[in-house]
């Protein structure tokens, strides 16, 4: 298959303060060491590596109610949003590498600043749409979408550090794929707002092509618009992605993951990609666990930019 040339901007976001344990900030380093930049170029893509962002700790970052590290996370997501906006203004597909999933506040808000009509495919075991009042633990990695949803604006307190965020999504702008660990407060939000999701129950009963057929028909069937893929590695089964912060059994297989990413690529509408939450051995994962997870994450990411299981060559 001949692959069209892409213009890609890669941003590293080595950040872990959206949750309490370190290790996830190693994700950008691991994907680069695995050859992400070189392999993207091998497919004929024009790639600009924007390097890793620097995220300063905010002093005296006391909890806001039960929300932990609010100012540090808020500042990090603002820095990332500005970087994503710059990549999109340069007319490049933005590939962001995390990092924990609190970063999605920045990647999606930064993308929407240039393409306000975007839609989101959220691949994850978790819904990540708790509000500060529904979150059982106060960790912001489980709350990014609540800051972005227009329908939740009235429910959101003024969390310090997030003053810059303007909600940019409506319920019709997002589809979840692979949910299987959803908090009660999140389930209530999904049902109340009518957000479309294909949990692992639906995924198990639908054929692989039907999952993406439903997703794409819902989001871009009538009106073509930019797609933002926010991909948490724990959306896949731990057997193929064991080194992640919140593994959850019963996830998507390697084959199912590749199909999803390949089909998103084929739309020609993929405009932003997050690859989120690969852990390091500092968390107790074995070297083999990390290697398997990074290889899986690399293959999924490259599938968004032209890598196909049938083989490929760059167009001339």
Curated annotation (Swiss-Prot):
A GO term for molecular function: manganese ion binding
Tissue-specificity statement: Strongest expression in liver.
Metal-binding keyword on record: yes
One GO biological process term: arginine catabolic process to ornithine
Residues at which Mn(2+) 1 binds: 101, 124, 128, 232
Cofactor field: Mn(2+)
Binding site for Mn(2+) 2: 124, 126, 232, 234
Catalytic activity, EC: 3.5.3.1
CC annotations in GO: cytoplasm; cytosol; nucleus
Induction text: Slow-response activation by thyroid hormone (T3).
Region listing for Disordered, in residue ranges: 1-26
Cited InterPro entries: Arginase, Ureohydrolase, Ureohydrolase_dom_sf, Ureohydrolase_Mn_BS
Co-factor: note: Binds 2 manganese ions per subunit.
Catalytic activity: L-arginine + H2O = urea + L-ornithine
Chain residues that bind substrate: 126-130, 137-139, 183, 246
PANTHER family per the UniProt record, alphabetical: ARGINASE (PTHR43782), ARGINASE-1 (PTHR43782:SF2)
Subunit structure: Homotrimer.
Similarity remark: Belongs to the arginase family.
Protein name: Arginase-1
Native species: Xenopus laevis (African clawed frog)
Top-level taxonomy: Eukaryota, Metazoa, Chordata, Craniata, Vertebrata
């Amino acid at each position: 298959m001949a692959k069209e040339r892409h213009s890609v901007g890669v941003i590293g976001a080595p950040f872990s303060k959206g949750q309490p344990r370190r290790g996830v900030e190693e994700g950008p380093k691991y994907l680069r060491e695995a050859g992400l930049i070189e392999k993207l170029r091998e497919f004929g893509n024009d790639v600009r590596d924007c390097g890793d962002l620097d995220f300063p700790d905010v002093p005296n970052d006391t909890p806001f109610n039960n929300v932990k590290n609010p100012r540090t996370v808020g500042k990090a997501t603002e820095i990332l949003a500005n970087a994503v906006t710059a990549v999109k203004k340069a007319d490049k597909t933005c590939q962001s590498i995390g990092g924990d999933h609190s970063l999605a506040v920045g990647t999606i808000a930064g993308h929407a600043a240039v393409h306000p009509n975007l839609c989101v495919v959220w691949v994850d075991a978790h819904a990540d749409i708790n509000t500060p009042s529904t979150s059982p633990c106060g960790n912001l990695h489980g709350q990014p979408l609540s800051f972005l949803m227009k329908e939740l604006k009235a429910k959101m307190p003024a969390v310090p550090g997030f003053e810059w965020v303007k909600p940019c999504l409506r319920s019709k702008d997002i589809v979840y794929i692979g949910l299987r660990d959803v908090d009660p407060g999140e389930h209530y939000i999904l049902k109340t707002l009518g957000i479309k999701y294909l949990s692992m129950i639906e995924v198990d009963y639908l054929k692989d092509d039907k999952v993406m057929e439903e997703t794409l028909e819902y989001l871009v069937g009538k009106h073509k618009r930019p797609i933002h893929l926010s991909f948490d590695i724990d959306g896949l089964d731990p057997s193929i992605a064991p080194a992640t912060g919140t593994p959850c059994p019963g996830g998507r297989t390697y084959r199912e993951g590749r199909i999803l990413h390949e089909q998103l690529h084929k739309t020609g509408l993929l405009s932003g990609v997050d690859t989120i939450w690969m852990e390091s051995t500092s968390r107790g994962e074995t070297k083999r666990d990390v290697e398997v997870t990074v290889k899986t994450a690399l293959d999924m990411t490259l599938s968004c930019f032209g890598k196909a299981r049938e083989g490929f060559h760059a167009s001339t």
